[in-house]
């Protein structure tokens, strides 16, 4: 059976996927999880998830398959972190690696990410990553604001736009979770709000709004319906039929209801991937409509 570690999860243009590393065999397997029924059981032991190549966007396993000590904050060991060489707040000092210097000199975009009418975030990413960065964050709609020749030029725009009242530079996962489980999203409404913000607040010309929901779930009714927060969330199991994933929140259907369960804290942990088994049952308050 071997020891398996969840080394990555994300939503691509082909939907939600996870990567499982077999630590004994030294192999990594990608799994498309939408439409699959499973339970992921998390164990306390943690291992390095490996390095990421900023230029090719490729991930590689940690050669030593390094175990991570208790209380260690990162998901990569120091050697793999050095190999990656990424410092997201490069503009605050702290040194820039050769890898990051090369990456910073590639074209970057400034984007507006929409989470709710009151939660608009401005950020930057390399033009090569573009939409994938938006999907990683779980934005529901988005708009590209500027195309710049480098990260430095993009960062100047980001700093300027983020100083605007009511515009976020970052959003906590707990806020994203609350919005996902309490707010309904309408792309037409989001588009109108983004256009107005870009034109009136930023003084820029709006570009075409991007609808991101179609990547999170193939079934439109999933995100159009209610996403529930379980009354009894588990910190060690995510279970059910996976009907999509928004950012790092897996959408798991049980007994006809869809629950959001965060997988972010499972990354770097040893896990059991129990295919076809539902080993944990979520519960939630009755639907409002059923009270009458």
Q: What are the roles of these predicted feature ranges?
A:
Residues 1-292:
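Non-catalytic accessory segments flanking enzymatic or RNA/DNA-binding domains
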